[in-house]
Amino acid sequence: MSSDPVAVITGAARGIGAATAARLAAAGWRLVLVDRAGDDPALPYRLATRADLDAVARACDGIAVVADVRDQPALTGAVGLAVDRFGGLDAAVAVAGGIAGGQVAWETDDAAWAAMLDVNVTVVWRLARAAVPALLQRPTPRQGRFVAVSSAGGTLGLPLLSGYSASKHAVVGFIRSLAAELGPYGVTANAVAPGSTETAMLDASAAVYGLASTEEFAGHHQLGRLVHADEVAALITWLCGPDSAAITGAVLPVDAGMTAS
């Protein structure tokens, strides 16, 4: 890894993305932080704001980029900014995503289904399209990293969230294929699979199931508690570093035991 490694993070304005930015910055990484920084009509909850993104960028001494991760030219531009400003790219971290549902699979309409695939898996592919060429520009022996956030819902079936669950399963398949393609170049691709994590997305999940509190999800975890965003960020940060060099194509749970049984 270079002395001043460089990463692009999507969904960086809050939650797991912001926590990852904080950890990577503390480890000496130079960062380009991408976020929509505005609400999305496809998602039933408020998203982060420009002020949120700017606050993360200031705290991390990173560069804030307001962009919709569904916009391929915007993502390519963010990666280009990292290369131009910092001299290259060592890691791409795909955190941006969303959750919506509330209907059984056969009553889910086309728009709702397509939205989940778009915001959860197509955006990971779009980041790979933008970032992998830059990762491969590093000289050999290179140690590039591509990390995506899947979900415990990417290994389990979740009622009333078929589109979300299908999209997160698709992230797993994509990452494993990407790992097979990148292996000969010395670049790894891995996914993390968080359980119920204390973020705004969990509030939306509670609404889907009619729960009075997100704490009710803790009963599905062997540890009896929710996952903290910083705990997911800790694993992402490790996957971006040199100690994870022999791991690729893996899906690593950070779920307090949600998928243990």
Model-derived regions, located:
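Short C-terminal tail/terminal secondary-structure segment
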Residues: 102, 156, 223-225, 237, ...
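Residue(s) in the substrate-gating loop at a strand-loop-helix junction
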Residues: 151
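Substrate-binding pocket helix/loop in short-chain dehydrogenase/reductase
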Residues: 103-105, 109-117, 217
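Short, small/polar-rich loop/turn modules that mediate ligand/substrate recognition or access, typified
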Residues: 143, 183, 188, 247-249
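Alpha-helical segment proximal to the catalytic Tyr-Lys
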Residues: 133, 180-184, 245
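Short-chain dehydrogenase/reductase
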Residues: 2-86, 100-101, 204
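Active-site helix of classical SDR
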Residues: 128, 167, 175
